[in-house]
Swiss-Prot record:
GO terms under biological process: tRNA modification
GO-annotated molecular function: 4 iron, 4 sulfur cluster binding; aspartic acid methylthiotransferase activity; metal ion binding; protein methylthiotransferase activity
Protein's UniProt name: Ribosomal protein uS12 methylthiotransferase RimO
Residue span(s) of domain TRAM: 372-437
GO cellular component terms, A-Z: cytosol
Keyword set, alphabetical order: 4Fe-4S, Cytoplasm, Iron, Iron-sulfur, Metal-binding, S-adenosyl-L-methionine, Transferase
Annotated catalysed reactions: L-aspartate(89)-[ribosomal protein uS12]-hydrogen + (sulfur carrier)-SH + AH2 + 2 S-adenosyl-L-methionine = 3-methylsulfanyl-L-aspartate(89)-[ribosomal protein uS12]-hydrogen + (sulfur carrier)-H + 5'-deoxyadenosine + L-methionine + A + S-adenosyl-L-homocysteine + 2 H(+)
Domain Radical SAM core: 131-369
InterPro entries: Elp3/MiaA/NifB-like_rSAM, Methylthiotransferase, Methylthiotransferase_CS, Methylthiotransferase_N, Methylthiotransferase_N_sf, NA-bd_OB-fold, Ribosomal_uS12_MeSTrfase_RimO, rSAM
Cofactor(s) recorded in Swiss-Prot or TrEMBL: [4Fe-4S] cluster
Cellular localization per UniProt: Cytoplasm
């Protein structure tokens, strides 16, 4: 009996990508083959995103495409929390499950295409199946979020914070390193809250006691000899404790912190920490401890009630903080979000668009000036793409897909996953250019 074949579509954020990796690992362990095409597969699984309207539309379109090309479709992920929305558009899907419903997905697969077990074939590597390139991997440390930001529905979709035991997380990280991963990207909905839900429970790791806590996790990962990058860090005071580890080179001098805005009025409406001056002082203090620190953040413009004065405050804050990387989103109403019930005046779409362009122009200017300062330096760069002696990679200050790149020329052939020293010879708004030495 030939092995059943499953085609897979993974949409959304890195957290959803890790969910997809877990499902695919389960499928491979039961003997299923993963098909690159819908046509010819026994069924298709679509892992959806349901956070923004644009993401919902993309998910519904992907489901429709899978139905057209295959006909047997199982839907999971965040949009799966709203089965009526999916059934209304696509009544012929076989099964719908919400996020993190791994067993339900596997049960649905078993009903459509029962597994063909082959106990003599080892189909799954020890670290599980990864959908990222071999040299980096996402490490998800928790599920859900206990914050109640008014623009967000993640707690409704994924529940409150549930931290994974620290010894389990460290075992997974160790397997990744043993498999050749050179960079671990720590992700969750709220990385700095890690362990709060279980009162920083202690566990044994390599004959010593460690706490399920952001600091302990950072310290232990920092001993594994690979790049460790922290994402989705909420700006709690105890983040300060991790900065010395960055200064010591234990983990990368990189913090991904979604500040969202700088106006106290807007932040209050968002139900976010509303102390932009305090935030600026903390960034300054972090840089005093770790001068090499790169800060990435995301912001929302056009939030209900945002005035021109509020927006100008955000631009002024960018000028003052001079963070290395910043993404910006135009506010989009999310079904079920508290922001819809605040009774605030909506910002016209053309004003949102104009503010977005002004924000991006400001940050581009800041980025250009900061990158110029790296010209002439020699920096370690991890290679993401290689074609003979030409390649593209990233410095310690840049995460994959969302940040800038280093365009490299070399006398010797470059290999994906290698970390090479590059002399930076030129820069532009977002990228660097240099020669491997």
């Amino acid at each position: 009996m030939s092995a059943p074949r499953v085609s897979f579509v993974s949409l959304g954020c890195p957290k959803a990508l890790v969910d997809s990796e877990r499902i695919i690992t389960g499928l491979r362990s039961e003997g299923y083959e993963i098909s690159r095409k819908h046509d010819g597969a026994d069924l298709v699984i679509v892992n959806t995103c349901g956070f923004l309207d644009s993401a919902r539309d993309e998910s519904l379109e992907a489901i429709g495409l899978a139905l057209n090309e295959n006909g047997k479709v199982i839907v999971t992920g965040c949009l799966g929390a709203e089965p009526d929305v999916i059934r209304e558009r696509h009544p012929n899907v076989l099964a719908i499950t919400g996020p993190q419903a791994y067993e339900s997905v596997m049960n649905a697969v078993h009903e459509v295409a029962p597994p063909a077990h082959d106990p003599f074939v080892d189909l799954v590597p020890p670290q599980g199946v990864k959908l990222t390139p071999r040299h980096y991997a996402y490490l998800k440390i928790s599920e859900g979020c206990s914050n109640r930001c008014s623009f967000c529905i993640i707690p409704a979709l994924r529940g409150d914070l549930v931290s994974r035991p620290i010894n389990e997380v460290l075992r997974e990280a160790e397997k990744l390193v043993q498999a050749g991963v050179k960079e671990i990207l720590v992700i969750s909905q709220d990385t700095s809250a890690y362990g709060l839900d279980i009162k920083y429970q202690e566990a044994m790791w390599q004959d010593r006691t460690v706490r399920t806590k952001f600091l302990d996790l950072s310290r232990e990962l920092g001993e594994m000899g690979v790049w460790v990058r922290m994402h989705y860090v909420y700006p709690y005071p105890h983040v300060d404790e991790v900065i010395p580890l960055m200064a010591e080179g234990k983990i990368l001098p990189y913090l991904d912190i979604p500040f969202q805005h700088a106006s106290p009025a807007v932040l209050k409406n968002m139900r976010r920490p509303a102390h932009q001056e305090k935030t600026s002082r903390r960034i300054q203090a972090w840089r005093e401890t770790c001068p090499d620190l790169a800060v990435r953040s995301t912001f929302i413009v056009g939030y209900p009630g945002e005035t021109e004065e509020d927006f100008q405050m955000l631009l002024d804050w960018l000028d003052e903080a001079k963070i290395e990387r910043a993404g910006c989103f135009k506010y989009e109403a999310v079904k079920g979000a508290k922001a819809n019930d605040l009774g605030l005046e909506q910002v016209p779409e053309e004003v949102k668009e104009a503010r977005w362009h002004r924000f991006m122009a400001k940050q581009q200017q800041i980025s250009t000036n900061l990158l110029k300062k790296k010209v002439g330096k020699r920096l370690p760069v991890i290679i993401d793409e290689a074609n003979g002696t030409i390649g593209k990679g990233r410095t310690r200050y840049d995460a994959p897909e969302i940040d800038g790149s280093v365009h490299i020329s070399s006398r010797r052939p470059l290999r994906v996953g290698d970390i090479v020293t590059v002399k930076i010879e030129a820069s532009d708004a977002y990228d660097l250019h240099g020669t491997a030495v």
